[in-house]
UniProtKB/Swiss-Prot annotation:
UniProt keyword terms in alphabetical order: Cell membrane, Coiled coil, Cytoplasm, Cytoskeleton, Developmental protein, Membrane, Microtubule, Stress response
Statement: the UniProt record of this protein carries the keyword DNA repair: no
Membrane topology label: Peripheral membrane protein
Chain segments annotated as coiled-coil in the UniProt record: 80-183
Gene Ontology biological process: anisotropic cell growth; cellular response to mechanical stimulus; cortical microtubule organization; cotyledon morphogenesis; leaf pavement cell development; petal morphogenesis; protein localization to cortical microtubule cytoskeleton
GO MF terms held by the record: microtubule binding
Record function comment: Microtubule-associated protein involved in the regulation of anisotropic petal and cotyledons growth and shape by affecting cortical microtubule organization. Prevents cortical microtubules organization into parallel arrays oriented perpendicular to the axis of cell elongation thus limiting anisotropic cell growth in the late phases of petal development.
Family, similarity comment: Belongs to the IPGA1 family.
Protein name in the entry: Protein INCREASED PETAL GROWTH ANISOTROPY 1
Origin species: Arabidopsis thaliana
InterPro entries, per database record: CHUP1/IPGA1-like
Free-text disruption phenotype from the record: Reduced interdigitated growth of pavement cells, with smooth shape. Long and narrow petals and cotyledons, as well as increased anisotropic cell expansion of petal epidermis in the late phases of flower development, as a result of increased microtubule ordering in petal abaxial epidermal cells and in cotyledons pavement cells. Enhanced cortical microtubules (CMTs) response to mechanical stress leading to aligned arrays. The an-t1 ipga1-2 double mutant exhibits stronger phenotypes than single mutants in term of longer and narrower cotyledons and leaves.
Annotated segments matching region Disordered: 1-60, 223-351
């Protein structure tokens, strides 16, 4: 500093380098660009060397001689200090830049992570939405399950109350039965035995549920002739003996069961069937397949006692004596195929019917004469056939599935566990069943259904065993068809016209009955085409399905029905006795029905032929009378003056 002051006083200016070094330490607000490298001063003379003036060379050289070296050293120290300050400032700025660089790198990394997280956000949002939907569904399911649980709890409480009521009712009924037994025990021995058995049956009725009754109603074999058991015999004897108190008691007891609700019936029936199923069922032996038994069952099945042909009544003896002359006409028809030889009764029935050409000729002549009349309306037969099909389908349909409840399932499980030997016995009997006569199939199917009705639910229990379902169904199908046809034959043979009834209603009834017979034959022919092979494979007889089998009995019954029809028409013609359109309409109606039956049955027997001849004679006399009346009217018209 001393040297500087000296220079100022002597008129020397500061060197630019010195000014630069003095200005360097000033602080910078912003980091400036790096300054150019400074030359470190080696000595004070080198740093502050003034420019050489050529005009004063000597003065300059001599001027350096006059100043000592101490001033130069002081100036160099100050410059070094200022340079160190600049370096430290630069270092500080470099550190700040490095810190900012690290901060920017961190921010860049955060930005990258943010971008990656942003790309994942839509997927996460969709997953969150799905989970929220699942949570809502689970909440709804939980609410629904809670409602179901509450409803089932209420139903369970109601069923418990009903069960307790049923138990109290059973106890009361048992007490009443015990009292009645005590009263009955004081009577005579025979009467006491029958009454005790009857009240034992009443106790069984009170123990059995409506479920088993409904299951028994499933099969259409409920119309089959019931085998008469000891229990039923005793019941019949009691009813005939006139025990009015027991009858009233039984009616009231049955009505009380019929009025109970479905839930009560199900609960009671399930619990009682579970208790009953604890004891294994001891099956009854199947019916024997013998001729005597077949005849006896046949006699029991059909009210008219006949051995050869149960349904149709036998004709009186005179026609049988008059019948031997026409065998040649029977030989004209082609004989039936010879599979199994038909029974004697069937051959006799076929021999009674022969073709009568007069019926066809008279019918065609009448149709030509009365061509203006409308043709037969066939809609009635179609409706009757449709009703018959609907009735059969409704009769064979199963009752709706029983509600899926724990007591019901427990009863089924109990039957499966306890009735195994019983069901295996039935499986063996069905598998080994082989028949040569259809009359043996009907009682066997009836016995099988009676045994299966002991189970709580036949289908639900049998599906746990190797049940021969196809063979059992084939046996039922054959028995149903045969029994339905026998029932039709019996109905036609037992038909009795009431003279007090109007002719139109009586004739309509006979027409409807004939249409049933006709439909039965047609359905049997369709069944023969489709089920004959199946029946043969299961060893079920098929000879009854042939034309020489039950079809001949149906045709004979239709011939008898035609005889009654023509007799009723003849009686109506005698009652009219006035001629006119009513009489002609009756004649046309009777001849049409006779022709239809003649074509269906293949002919008439002797009695029916007599009835037809009587109708034909009356028709001819009526026609002659009408022609004479018409002729008289014409003569009167001509004789009348204009």
């Amino acid at each position: 500093m001393v040297a500087g002051k000296v220079r100022v006083t002597m008129g020397f200016h500061k060197s630019p380098s010195t000014k630069k070094t003095k200005d360097m330490p000033s602080p910078l607000p912003l980091p400036p660009p790096p300054p150019p490298p400074l030359k470190p001063p080696s000595s004070g003379s080198a740093t502050t060397k003034p420019p050489i003036n050529p005009s004063k060379p000597g003065f300059t050289r001599s001027f350096g001689v006059y100043f000592p070296r101490a001033s130069a050293q002081v100036h160099a120290t100050a410059a070094a200090a200022s340079h160190n300050g600049v370096v430290s400032e630069l270092r500080r700025q470099v550190e700040e830049l490095r810190e900012r660089e690290a901060l920017l790198k961190t921010e860049n990394l955060e930005v990258k992570l943010l971008r990656e997280s942003v790309s994942v956000i839509p997927l996460l949002e969709s997953q969150i939405a799905d989970k929220n939907g699942e949570i809502d569904e689970l909440r709804k399911e939980t609410a629904r399950l809670a409602e179901d649980n509450e409803r089932l709890r209420r139903e369970f409480d109601r069923s418990e109350e009903m069960r307790r009521e049923c138990e109290t009712r059973e106890k009361e009924m048992e007490a009443e039965i015990v009292e009645l037994r005590k009263l009955v025990s004081s009577e005579s021995d025979d009467h006491a035995l029958s009454v005790s058995q009857r009240f034992q049956g009443l106790m069984d009725v009170s123990a059995k549920s409506n479920l088993i009754r409904s299951l028994k109603r499933v099969g259409s074999l409920r119309n089959l002739p019931e085998p008469i058991t000891n229990q039923e015999n005793t019941n019949k004897s009691i009813s005939s003996s006139g025990d009015a108190d027991g009858d009233i008691y039984r009616k009231d007891e049955i009505e009380s069961y019929s009025r109970s609700s479905n839930s009560e019936e199900l609960t009671e029936s399930s619990s009682l069937s579970t208790v009953r199923s604890r004891v294994p069922r001891v099956p009854k032996p199947p019916p024997k397949r013998s001729i005597s038994l077949g005849d006896s069952t046949e006699n029991r099945a059909d009210p008219p006692p006949q051995k050869s042909i149960p349904p149709p009544p036998p004709p009186p003896p005179p026609p049988l004596l008059q019948q031997p002359p026409p065998p040649p006409s029977v030989s004209k028809a082609p004989p039936p195929p010879p599979p199994p030889p038909p029974p004697k009764s069937l051959s006799i029935a076929s021999a009674k019917v022969r073709r009568v050409p007069e019926v066809v000729e008279f019918y065609h002549s009448l149709m030509r004469r009365d061509s203006t009349n409308s043709r037969r309306d066939s809609t009635g037969g179609g409706n009757a056939a449709a009703e018959a099909i609907l009735a059969n389908s409704n009769a064979r349909d199963m009752i709706g599935e029983i509600e899926n409840r724990s007591v019901y399932l427990l009863a089924i499980k109990t039957d499966v566990e306890t009735q195994g030997d019983f069901i295996r016995f039935l499986i063996k009997e069905v598998g080994n069943a082989a028949f040569s006569d259809i009359e043996d199939v009907v009682p066997f199917v009836k016995w099988l259904d009676d045994e299966l009705s002991y189970l709580v639910d036949e289908r639900a229990v049998l599906k746990h065993f190797e049940w021969p379902e196809q063979k059992a169904d084939a046996l039922r199908e054959a028995a149903f068809c045969y029994f339905d046809l026998k029932k039709l034959i019996s109905e036609a043979s037992r038909f009795r016209e009431d003279p007090r009834q109007s002719s139109s209603s009586a004739l309509k009834k006979m027409q409807a009955l004939f249409e049933k017979l006709e439909h039965g034959v047609y359905s049997l022919s369709r069944m023969r085409e489709s089920a004959a092979t199946k029946f043969k494979s299961f060893q079920i007889p098929v000879d009854w399905m042939l034309e020489t089998g039950i079809t001949s009995q149906i045709k004979l019954a239709s011939v008898k029905l035609a005889m009654k029809y023509m007799k009723r028409v003849s009686a109506e013609l005698e009652a009219i006795e006035g001629g006119g359109p009513e009489e002609e309409e009756l004649i046309v109606q009777g001849v049409r029905f006779a022709f239809r039956v003649h074509q269906f049955a293949g002919g008439f027997d002797a009695e029916t032929m007599k009835a037809f001849e009587e109708l034909r004679d009356k028709a001819r006399s009526c026609h002659v009378q009408c022609q004479s009346q018409t002729h008289q009217h014409k003569l009167c018209f001509r004789s009348t003056p204009c």
